[in-house]
């Protein structure tokens, strides 16, 4: 087996060298025109994405062979490695079939505006850091920016898988059980699919958040910097700072404040303060939208739908929306306190148990209090859902959890009021379940049983 693998890897290396050499020779002799003679764009395909997906799939094949040849895969990590490549190869093939990508064009417009010393367009709803950084690749054009951001998202996809497994392990899941959950979760996942399909910044922000959670107290500077970056990319992760604050790690808080300010100064140094005022203007514009977008499953969009039917003016709707979000915030804080008190997710003996028990409910606040909640924002509720798996025991609770999970992650995106607002209801159901399980005295038998079963599962890697 080892000899066959070595031969396969040598063949892969030779073929890779031949492909690379052919591209170089064709380009040097005939330029881009010459490449066009050998490469065709199929209808309903994006050539940039097609070539990237093909190249990365080929590199994955080489990486698998390299790991096997060098005995890097063993009985301890085979689940983890296999899960990684299953997820990556699945999405490389799925995303290759998509020929139109969305939100990166908003980023391109914003970056172009900054480069031309113009105000940020009203379609850009983030702090100015992202647009400030992207302006340096604007000269590459539309397809050049798509190529870079598409690659970044594939890297973030792999990082998301790795960090999700590590976070679940942090909460007591065995490695194999965590891998199975991560692979199943990522394989059928509407918010994840749409985040990648729109080349969205959400996946980057979620990776930064999970990395910040894992590095807390191990390296306070890195942890604080990662969360500060997430806030500058998406703003809403600021809600998670409360969980870190409850740990009373003043060193971490000082680093967070300092790094947040230093990052904020990057756009100021390059563009002045105007982009921040543009951001505030764009957020204010959101509060004056009068119609409902059924893709936007926020409280704002939901209540605006009733305005023409009930004769409610926009100001009254804004007050109702603010009231609903305030109630959600209070409910989440109450549930968070109960989770900390009852050690819902981790025991008192676990390091950083306050942070780990507090943060799941805050992901729901972070998601639903935003003025716009698109389908892909559901990726931010990942841990709120998955960490409940070992807390629920009764059939009734499983039915409620399954219903919420179906609405949030499995149901395709569609526009049909009020049924398409299931992604507004699903996190609220999970918040209620977080509260309900604090009343239960049952031990997490599912987690214990699943961990034991997967750890006792034995197999051998042939050499």
Where are these regions (language model features)?
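Aromatic-enriched
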Residues: 22, 26-53, 387-457, 463
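Short alpha-helical segments used as structural interaction elements across diverse proteins
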Residues: 231, 322, 373-374, 420, ...
